[in-house]
Amino acid sequence: MKYGFFDESKKEYVITRPDTPAPWVNYLGSPEYGAIISNNAGGYSFAKSGANGRILRYIFNQFDQPGRYIYLRDQESKDYWSASWQPVGKDLNSYKSECHHGTAYTKMMADYSEIHSEVRYYVPLDQSYEVWNLAVTNTSDRMRKINVTGYAEFTNNSNYEQDQVNLQYSQFITRTVFRGNRVRQMIHANLDQLEDGKDVDDKIVVDRFFGLAGAKVDSWCGSREGFLGRYHGYNNPVGVEDGILNCEGNYNENGCGALTTILTLHPGETKEIAFLVGMKEDVDAETIVSRYEDCEKICRNELEELIQYWHGHLSHFQVKTPSEEFNTMINTWNAYNCFMTFIWSRAASYTYCGLRNGYGYRDTVQDIQGVIHLAPEMAVEKIRFMLSAQVNNGGGLPLVKFTHNPGHEDTPDDASYVQETGHPAYRADDALWLFPTVYKYISETGNLEFIDEVIPFANKEEGTVYEHLKRAVDFSMNHLGKHGMPAGLYADWNDCLRLGKDGESTFVALQFYYAMTILKEFAEYKKDTEYLNYLEESQKKLEKLIQDLCWNEDRFIRGFTEDGEVIGQRTDPEANMWLNPQSWSVISGLANEAQADLALQNVYDKLNTEYGAILMDPPYHAHAFEGALAVIYNAGTKENAGIFSQSQGWIILAEALRGHGERAFNYFIENAPAAQNNRAEIRRLEPYCYGQFTEGKHSPNFGRSHVHWLTGTASTVMVGCVEGILGMRPDFYGLKIAPSVPKEWEEFEIEKDFRGSHLHIVVKNPGHAESGCEKLFVNGEQMKDNYIPQEKLTKTTEVELFLS
């Protein structure tokens, strides 16, 4: 079943049926002010932190309520509806709507009772408040009086848990008042006589506002109970039914902002207003609301500026291939998904309620990879930040606080860190993600000076980027298991594998092998011969260990338990085949050609499904070892034989590195949201963003996806497609082009900005090959192979590649 379509000309997804199988959401804002909005205007807002900066309330894991609601009421007939289908929920035979999710904005259009409305939700660039710009048009042949009411439900405390759970406290600290064109909410209002800089138990007055611009306020309400009324809900609030609000504030209940204006519309006439929401002191709120009196002009300009900003970032890499699904994901939605995970990590969505008050180390370092080719200047700032969250022993802080203070942080070795973050120990893989991320940034930009930039460690000391990477090697070397391979510690990438200080992870061993390959390149550049020799010797030892211990006839095992038990050997009754060791044996370069092809074939034969490759098989049930925490999940779910979507990016890349274009693209299309637009009732998640996992073949809901938007899938699939399928593989001194594509792709184009040059790349495939370069021309000059040295680049570089 289909609920909408992609409009690539505007880079929008257009929802034509509002009764989607789940809330389909979009992200608005920036790291300073974030907002999540669904196709029915549900969602919430927060300043900086979804945990400690919550502004608008949202109730998770129930109906998609409350939200950013605008009610319209015909003053003559007293009939009312909402500018989004919900919350009023008029009969869809008479109520028509569209929702356009774009890049950092959402538009909702509705037609009912010969009234057309269009509301545009966005956060202006470089601002920390949101705008609901509403246009109402009278499409009838008679004069109409339309009562318009905007409703925003405030949290009673900026902390999500305090607002939702600690009601004996949070309900008695807020009040609301009316200030001419806005409702002002004050948290801890009774502290308004404190001197500047003073607090009581770390508490001060916090101001929020809900304002109206472009029309006068005819009535208002600052109390949720007063607006909704007893035994009423968001679908039939008393304030809307009556056509007038009670003009009363909140004192010791639940605060809200509700503002009503009555618009008189002649036939064909349109009027615009704007509602504004934010966390600002009252004097600043007054200035903001007054700025939007000419809301039509300013809102148009702000929205256009926002579109140009995001489309500008996306324009740095665009493709035109025979696959529309591939094009829309790479050009727009996978790219935008990468930016959202880059900004919000796993801090705030409809699944992540905001309790993770910081950046996960491994998550964030991987997320950076997805935007390096689009916004290297943004990427390097986050790389610096994450390097400064590396402990001086080489490990990463499992959770990096939003208030991170480099050089002064506690670590998992300190009880205070464990108590504050809930993370009791280091993870084996965290710092190893730095190697490909730093390498990709330097290779994309050619900024080799970055390797010598000095950055502090999280707790104490400082060092160059090169030194940070060496410390990461030290961390792995200092945490080896019984056989001499890297220990799994509290977790490797798979949080459901608790291997401890003696158990060993093949996945981490392959990561470590790859890390040493990368660091050898940096050591060569630095002419650090002594350290280069150390890496060569260490890598050879590790390679022998992996080959001797981990290759099991036709697959790489997953590792060893603390008791030395093998995980993932052919004879195991459960979990005898694992996805990630096979893909990473290829990505790391450790597997020989025969092993690589045999391992990948086994993945395809034993793990692949129509929705992607499952993480392992068979699922755990009766034979899980003590550290196999995946057994807590239902079969076919998450780490217990679910289709863990992040791993799809790695299998795409692995197949592409082997030149298997058909197989690489097949893995992409199986798990691509856009390719499931016509099966929305099965997938349920948005058809324009990735989810964390899809239920596997052992689930009765095979194909249903979960945990939208904020997932490492966005970056791994982007890397798998850009570096793998499209073959864009820069290094320190230029760009290698090595596509691995479906045979039927006779021609495709890539537009890529690279080191100050705009590359227009045309790939021709008359022989229907999957991979291989016959000849490469750069500005008409034939290269000796498929590599473009940097000195061959011009301001506009025309590239023509023939596959063979």
Please give the residue ranges for each predicted region.
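Carbohydrate-active enzyme catalytic cores, enriched for enzymes
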Residues: 2-17, 22-23, 541-544, 548-612, ...
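Carbohydrate-binding/catalytic loop surfaces
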Residues: 349-358, 398-427, 458-464, 483-505, ...
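Hydrophobic, small-residue-rich alpha-helical packing segments that form membrane-like cores
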Residues: 104-106, 499-514
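Extended, well-ordered alpha-helical scaffold segments
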Residues: 287-295, 301, 305, 329, ...
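Anionic coordination/interaction segments
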Residues: 1-362, 376-385, 389, 440-444, ...
